[in-house]
Amino acid sequence: MPNFASTPAPVHTLWDTPDMATQRLPGVWWVTTPSHGGFVLSDERQAAMPEALRLDSIYYEEDVNWSLVVIGFEAEFAKLKDQNFDIERDLAHQTARHWRPCQYGAFTGEVITPSDSYVLKKVEILEASIGEIGVRSASGDWADWVPKGKVGVTGQRIAGCDHLGFVRYEGPDFTGLCDAARYDSTRPVNTFAALGVELLPSP
């Protein structure tokens, strides 16, 4: 296992000025800032990240991309004998499998399916919805144009999505109303057809 140099704590980050920085491994800093946080790697560490897991930037944010660093240097982290590392390691694998399935599969050799990954499941649903009108915004009956018990929706046709499940829309805007009980903002996508939207005339 190569020896890596310790580095000074980051003074500036992509997110903000750090208010806390801990060197978890030589050249691997965990920082928090007033706005966000995550891992910051030295240039040496960034070059040593497995190619399948390496990002273009040295910043691996705390919501998802941190998991790539833990997996990439898993053996070194394990050698520290941190009593909580087993939990962190399991969470890292779960996070990467769900949210970075292509990178995780490329690194581990596992075949990741939609049942294993939230992102792949979302992509599957979106690809099945291409051509339909997808909801882009919704308003409750607090809005002056939405009757009581309804949800007002606006949307465009779904043209596709990328590998992370970010939707690409195209064409004109559509506006309509659906029953409030049918609208669920937690779905990966809401289509006008699935909601039974009653289209409103264009302004």
Predicted regions span which residues?
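Short, compact, well-ordered microdomains
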Residues: 63-115, 164-202
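Short His-Asn-centered micro-motif
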Residues: 42, 60-63
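Eukaryotic intrinsically disordered, low-complexity regions
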Residues: 121-203
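Catalytic phosphate/metal-binding cores of nucleic-acid and nucleotide-processing enzymes, i.e., regions
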Residues: 15-18, 23-26, 47-56, 64-70, ...
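Alpha-helical interaction segments
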Residues: 5, 56-59, 89, 93-94
